[in-house]
């Protein structure tokens, strides 16, 4: 039988329902329907039993096409409470298992298709415990071991915007961490593992784990598929405004084995400017990539798009340099030190980055650089207390 729903919970409704079995005159039933409008959901016709109950009169009955299975209603005042989670350690013979949840990034709205908040680096969110961009806390544990495997992994989107926000938020997982980023919505719809929702709706992407042991991040690896468990991507489109849609969290259960000497939390960067904008030597933790360092136009700009506090030392082989500025997603902590001698300048400072990419300004920049030939830089993750420069 098609489901019949009365619109208004009026006293006349209850009275009519109680009187229907007792009424002998169909005309009185029809009169009751005149004051009790009905809506049939699902767009289906009434069954014979329903017609016999309601009589021949049907002028006050309307048919509406209801929401299809899986549809989500826009909430009016519903929010999610996100409590802190203590990491759980489970020890077994030869390995240790960690269960935890971490914050990844805030999702920014965009009218056109934008992937990873506009960060164009391939493999930014590589699924590897040593990847600081995806596992801010876990990276400190991962550097103590040589191999890992995920037994549970899922990405959760928690909205912070209202139900009037427009657009879509897509969560994606690509098994190949070296695949290029999707450039259109057709590419997004082709992913085997994806989840798409409105910006005001919660969303979860469950990643299928294969129970395979892999090596930690190795900067010398030719094929990253041997060390990475794919890559995570997120995309937004058809949105408006500048307020973040929501936050992304990663929930995981990961096992480590084969302890090794501590790998460190330092990134080393070296570029001969006379060669090109790419092809630089980068070792250690992937706080930055080639594209994040701009050395053209007489200025140097560096983008650190991973949240955290960092101690930075940059050495510039140049005749002279201009001031150090922070106009992007970072701010200076304390003061900076500057030393110039024999055609080279060294700057040391501490910065705090929000991790949200800024398409207009770099995290920090050095202006008016004359006759630049080489850029060397070390970036160390730290805390303001241990890296503060008075």
Swiss-Prot record:
Region described as P domain, projecting: 257-390
A Gene Ontology molecular function term of the record: RNA binding
Complex formation: Homodimer. Homomultimer.
Protein name: Capsid protein
Region of interest called S domain, virion shell, as start-end residue ranges on this chain: 95-256
Entry keyword set: Calcium, Capsid protein, RNA-binding, T=3 icosahedral capsid protein, Virion
Primary residence: virion
Listed SUPFAM superfamilies: Positive stranded ssRNA viruses
Subcellular location as annotated: Virion
Role of this protein: Capsid protein self-assembles to form an icosahedral capsid with a T=3 symmetry, about 32-35 nm in diameter, and consisting of 180 capsid proteins. Also acts as a suppressor of RNA-mediated gene silencing, also known as post-transcriptional gene silencing (PTGS), a mechanism of plant viral defense that limits the accumulation of viral RNAs.
Gene3D superfamilies: 2.60.120.20, 2.60.40.4030
Cofactor(s) for this UniProt protein: Ca(2+)
Top-level taxon of the source organism: Viruses
Record field: transmembrane: none
GO cellular component: T=3 icosahedral viral capsid
Note accompanying the cofactor annotation: Binds 4 Ca(2+) ions per icosahedral asymmetric unit, itself composed of three capsid protein subunits. Ca(2+) ions probably promote virus assembly and stabilize the virus particle.
Family that this chain belongs to: Belongs to the icosahedral plant coat protein family.
Alphabetical list of PROSITE patterns matching this protein: ICOSAH_VIR_COAT_S (PS00555)
InterPro entries: Capsid_prot_S-dom_vir, Viral_coat
